[in-house]
Amino acid sequence: MTTTNTSIFGPRVNNSKFNNNNNNNNNNNNNNNNTSNNNNSNIIKPPQVVQETQQQQQAQQQPLQTNEEVCVICKSKNVQVCTGCLMVYYCGAEHQNIDWPNHKSLCSGLNRRNDLLDRAEKSKDLRKKLQSDIFSSGNRVSNSNNNSSIYSNSTGNINNNNNSNNNNIKGGIGGGAVTNSSTVMAPERKSIAISNIKHLQQQIQQTQQTQQQPPPTTTSIPTQPNSSSFNKPTAKKPGTSFKSSSSGDNTPINQSPSSSSSSLVSSTNNNNNNNNNNNNNNNINSNSNNMSGSSGGIKALQNQLQNSINNKPSNTTSNSPNPSPPSSTFVPNSNNNSNSNSSSGSGKSNLNISLKSSTSSSPVTSTYLYNNNNSNSNSNSNNSSTETTTCISSNSNNSSNIENSDNTNEENGMKNIKNKLSQINFGAPPPSFKKPTSKVIENEDNNNSNNDGTLKQSSSSDSIYFNNNNNNNNNNNNNNNNNNNNNNNNNNNNNNNNNNNNNNNNNNNNNNNNNNNNNNSNNNNFDINNSNNIINNKQSTCSSIDGLSYNNNNSGSSLKNSVPPTTSNTPPRKRSSGGSSSSNNSNIGSNGNRIGFIKEHKKNQSLPDSFVDFYQSNKNQSNGYESLLDNDDNKTRGYGSFNENDDSHEECDDDDDDDDGGGQDGDDGLDGTEFKRGRNRPTGLRTNNNAVFEWESGTIEYSTNNTSQHKKLGVGSRGGNSFSKDTQSQSTNSTTTDDHQTGSILNSNSGSSDDLQQQQTQTQQQQSQLSAGVGRIAGKFRMIGGDIKKKAAIVGTLTKNKVSEVTSKSKSSTSVNNNNNDEVDHNENNNNNNNNINNNNNNNNNNIENIIFGIPLEEAVKKSATLHPLIPDVIYKSIEYIREKGIQEEGIFRLSGSANAITLLKNEFDRGVNVDLYQQLDQHVVSGILKLYLRQIPETLFTQDFGEELEELRVGGNSSDAISKRIAGSIILLQRLPESNRCILHYLCNLLNAISFEPSTKMGTVNLAIVFAPTLGVSVEVMTCLISYYDEIFGIQTYNYNS
C-alpha cells in the first residue's frame, strides 16, 4: 500500500509497517468505531469527478458476465482468465490492455494486488486536480487534546500486524491522515487537502509564536519533518532509542513517557501465528472540517511554512509542562515503527527527551497482559478519558522466572508428566517387581504465577532432584537448606535410584548376575544379624536362595547400583544361579543343616529316582526315602557317599570292587560348603567294542568272545547308565558262571585245605556280589525289556529264513535224486531263471548307457544332444525354461529348490526319459538341476589345461588395463576350448547377462559370478568379465555344427 505525499496531505498517524510473512493479512480497519467527518464546508465538485463517480457506481451495480469463458473483446474461446478477479477472460495481452480502462474499476483483485504503477498514476492525477482546483470550507476544529501513541510489541515468532486505517480515518492527529489512492474518491481527498491547508496555517502561527518566546532548558525534536528537507539524526542519549520509520525520519523514542495525558498501550504477543487486530476505538477522533474559506494555494502555504521553519532558532521553546516521574518503565521493541505525538496546546508536536534513567524510586505500577494461545485477535481499546499503562517488567534480578504465557497449569502438568516419564525404568525390573515411590516434596509457590513443576526443598526433609538427559529441562529453584541432594542421572539403560531415608543402618544388596543390575535400598528400622541365622527352605522345588548379601556392621553408607531399589516390605528375590555372601556361614546354620537344590539335567540323561527326590535330608526322611549317607543298602546299590571337598561328582558305577559298594571314600556327613555346579550330573556312558547294541538303528553286531576279558554291555544314548563287567557277564550267561563256580569247587579238592578255604571265601564273595548285582541289573533290564523282545523277534525271523532256505535246498536235492524224469523240467526252470537274470542285467546295462550326469561332456553330447548339436538336452532345456519363466524370478540361481524334486528330475534324465520341464512350477528346481549337472562334470567347462592362463587373467583387479587384458585373454582362451564347452559357455553367459539387467531378480553380475565361478572352475574376476562384456567376448565366436 502506498501513501500520498506528506507535504500535501499531512503527516501519517501511524507510520508502523509490518511485513506479512505467512500470508496472514490482518487489516485493522476501524469501520464502525470511528465517527465520520463533519464536513460543514460547501464543496463544489467538478463535473468530471461527478461523472467518474457515477460510472463507478453503475459499474459496481452491473454484475460480471462469467457464464462463458470467452474473450470480452473478440468473443474468442482461446482465452486466459484475469488474475485479479478470476472472472473476466481475454484472448491475449492486447485485448486486455484495450479493455483495462473499463475493467480496472470492476476488478476485485485490486485491493489484493500491489498495483503500484496504477496507483502512482492516480496519485499524480489527483495532485494535479488538487493544485488546480482548491475550494474553501468552514473552520477546521482539530481535536489534538487526546493524543495516543500506540506501541505494538511483537515478541512472538510469526506476528502479522497491519495497523492501517483504511477509508475510515478522515482526519489525522496533528494534521496527518492516511489515505489510499486507489480507494479514496476525489471529493473526499479535496476535503482532506482543504483541512490540511488550515492545519498548515496553524503551524505557521505556532512557529511564529515559538520564535518570540525564550528557549527552555529541555530540548525537543519536531516529529513533523519537512517534505523537502530532513533533520539530521541526533546522537543517542541515555534513555532514548532511535527507530527507523517508513517516512525516512529517525525519531528517538523515550523509554519513560513525558506527558501525563498521553497513554501508552503495549500489546505483547507471545504466541505463534497470532493475528493481532488492533482496533483503535474512540481514540483517533474524527476531525470536524469547519473550514469556511482560505486564501492562497497549498504551494504558497508550504513555502511560507518552510521559510518560517528555516528562520527559527536552534533552541525552540515548548509550552508543554515538565514531565512527571514515570509510573512504569516501558522498553519498546525495535520492530515497532510508530510516531508519538504529544500535544501541549500548540499545533506542533514535540517529543521531550528526559535525561533521567529509566528506573525511578516510585513503585512500578504494571499490568501484565498475556495473550491466550487459542485467540486469533487481540483488540486493545484505548479510551481518551482513562489513562492505563500496560507494560512488562523484565527484571533480571528476580529469583522467580516469570514466563510470558498464560499456560500456568497446563504447562506445569505437561512438564511434570515429562519428568515422570523420563524417570521410568525401561530395563531391568521384572513385571512383578514393584518400584518404590520416592518421597519428593514439591512446594508450589502460590505468590508467583509460575508453576513450572520444579522440585523445591524444605528445611526438615531431603529431596531428590531428577536430572533427565532425554531433552527435558528442569528449572530448579535454589533454597537455603540444602542438606542431602542425591542427583540421579536417568540415562537410557542405566538407572540409578537411591532412596536415602533418615535411619540408614543396614544395606540389603540384591545382586542379579543375569541382568548385571544391583538393587540398593536403605531401610529405616530393619536390622539383620547373620551370625547364627538358620534358613530352612520347605518348598517342594527347593530353589537356592542366592543373591542375598548380609552386612553385620551397622553402617550408614549406601552403594549406588544400577537397579531401582526394593522397599522394606518387599522380600529379596530368589534366584537359581550362584550367590554371594559377605559373611561366613550365611547359608549353613550351626546345626549343620544346608539348603538343598535341584539341578536341571539335559534331555535323555536319566537320573535315579533317589537323586530326583533327594534335595534335603529332612525332606527325604519325611517322604519315606532312606538316608543315602549312612545306609549300607544304598551303598551296595551303587550310590556312594558324596564328598563335599571334591570338585566334581564321580560317576555312579561299581567298577571298583574294593570300595564299599563301588562308591568313593570320604566323610558321610556334609560339610558347610555348598554343592558344586556339576555335583549330581552323570558323566558320559562307557561302551565297549566287544558287543554293541544299537537300539536306534535296529541292528545287532556280533564279535568273537575274548576269554581273557569279560564282556561289557554298553547302552546307547537312550539308555540310562553303564554297568560293571562282572555283573554284565553274569547276567548275560548266568548258567556259565554257575558251572564255572562248581568247577572251581571240584578242582579245589585236589589241593590243600588252605587253598580250599581261600576258594570258599572267594566263592562267597562272588555270590554276595552276584546277589547284589543281579537285583540291580534286573531292574535295569525291566526298562529295556521291550526293546530286547523286539530284537529277539528280529533274530528269530532271521533264523527262520535261514532254516527255510536250508530246507528248500534239501528238498530240491532229494527230489532230483528220487525223480530222474523231472530233471528236464528242472533244467528248463533253471534256464528260465538264467534268462530272467540275463534280461535284468541287460536292463541295467541299458540304464547305465542312458546316464548323462557325471560322465564326460563329449559322451553326454553324443547321448542326449537331440535339440542342439553341441549342447546336452538337460542344459538346453534348463536354459530355455529359465529364459522364458525365470528371468525375472527373485534370487534365481541363488535360492535352492526342493531337493526331492531335483533328485526326481535327475533320475528321469538318467533313464533317458524325454522330460518336459515346463510342467515344473518352481523355477529354482530347474536352476538347481542345471547347477547340479555342471557341478558333476568330471572336467570343468574350462578344463584343466588352462589353469595358468586363467590365473594370469585374474591378476590386475578392476583397472581398465586389467579389464581390457582380461577381455582379450578370454577371447583367445575360448577359441582354444572344445566347441561343446565353448557353446555351453556361450549360451550360459547369454542367459546370465540378461538376468543381470533385471532388477527384480536382485542378482547382479557379481552375485551371478560368485555362484557360477566355482562350478565352472574359473575365478570370480574372469566370470564377471564374461557376463559383463558378453557381446565383446562371444560376438566373434564361431562354431562348426557339421562336425
UniProtKB/Swiss-Prot annotation:
Any GO CC annotation of this UniProt entry: cytoplasm
The residue ranges of the Rho-GAP domain are 855-1043
InterPro entries named among the record's database cross-references: Rho_GTPase_activation_prot, RhoGAP_dom, Znf_MYND
Acidic residues compositional bias, start-end: 644-671
* Superkingdom: Eukaryota
Give the Gene Ontology MF terms in alphabetical order.
GTPase activator activity; zinc ion binding
> What ranges does the record list as Low complexity composition bias?
14-44, 201-225, 254-293, 307-411, 467-532, 547-594, 726-736, 752-771, 801-821, 829-842
Q: Which PROSITE patterns match?
A: RHOGAP, ZF_MYND_1, ZF_MYND_2
Primary role? Rho GTPase-activating protein involved in the signal transduction pathway.
Site positions (Arginine finger) are 894
- Coiled coil regions in record: 825-852
As for subcellular location, the record says: Cytoplasm
A Pfam family recorded for this sequence: RhoGAP
* SMART domains according to UniProt: RhoGAP
What is this protein's record name? Rho GTPase-activating protein gacZ
Alphabetical GO biological process terms: small GTPase-mediated signal transduction
Q: Where are the transmembrane segments?
A: none
Taxonomy of origin reads: Eukaryota, Amoebozoa, Evosea, Eumycetozoa, Dictyostelia
Q: Where are the zinc fingers (MYND-type)?
A: 71-107
Q: What does the UniProt keyword field contain? A: Coiled coil, Cytoplasm, GTPase activation, Metal-binding, Zinc, Zinc-finger
Q: Specify whether Metal-binding is a keyword of the entry.
A: yes
Query: Which intervals of the chain are annotated as region Disordered?
Result: 1-44, 137-163, 199-532, 546-594, 614-690, 706-772, 801-842
